[in-house]
């Protein structure tokens, strides 16, 4: 009976940890001077990363599948003209965007220091 109860407790603890959402909000205001309100949302449970900037329009507002590695989180956004790779270093919280242009065969990188921020309090869900 004790083993059954112990097993049930361990199972419940495991299920409760799975139910906890692993969403991290990062404020990264220095990646693009036109987007000082840039928020990066890393959703580990769904395996996605979102960039949200109300002031920027559609250029920096997107969600993409992300890889959550032990030292960094990476994702990409490709268009006809550009291939962009984003990464966040888990230790330093530095966001890096590397853009490759097929037309000019050049690569350009930008970085921004980020801070962990809280989700907006007015959100109901």
PLM regions and their residue ranges:
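Positively charged n-region of N-terminal signal peptides that target proteins for export
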Residues: 1-7
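N-terminal signal peptide c-region/cleavage motif recognized by signal peptidases
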Residues: 14-18
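Short, hydrophobic/aromatic-rich segments at coil-to-beta transitions
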Residues: 20-27, 47-50, 67-76, 92-96
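Short, solvent-exposed loop/hinge segments that bridge or flank secondary-structure elements
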Residues: 23-48, 78-90
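N-terminal glycine/threonine-rich, aromatic-flanked beta-hairpin/loop signature
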Residues: 40-61, 94-106
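Contiguous, well-ordered beta-strand patches that form the walls/edges
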Residues: 56-88
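Edge beta-strand at a domain terminus
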Residues: 104-125
């Amino acid at each position: 009976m004790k083993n059954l109860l112990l097993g049930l407790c361990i199972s419940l603890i495991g299920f409760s940890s799975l139910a906890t959402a692993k969403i991290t909000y990062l404020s990264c205001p220095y990646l693009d001077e036109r987007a000082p309100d840039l928020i990066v949302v890393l959703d580990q449970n769904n395996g996605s990363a979102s960039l949200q900037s109300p002031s920027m329009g559609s250029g920096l507002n997107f969600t993409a599948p992300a890889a959550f590695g032990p030292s960094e989180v990476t994702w990409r956004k490709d268009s006809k003209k550009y291939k962009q790779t984003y990464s966040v270093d888990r230790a330093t919280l530095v966001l890096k965007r590397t853009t490759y242009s097929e037309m000019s065969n050049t690569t350009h990188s930008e970085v921004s220091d980020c801070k962990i921020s809280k989700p907006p309090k007015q959100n109901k869900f």
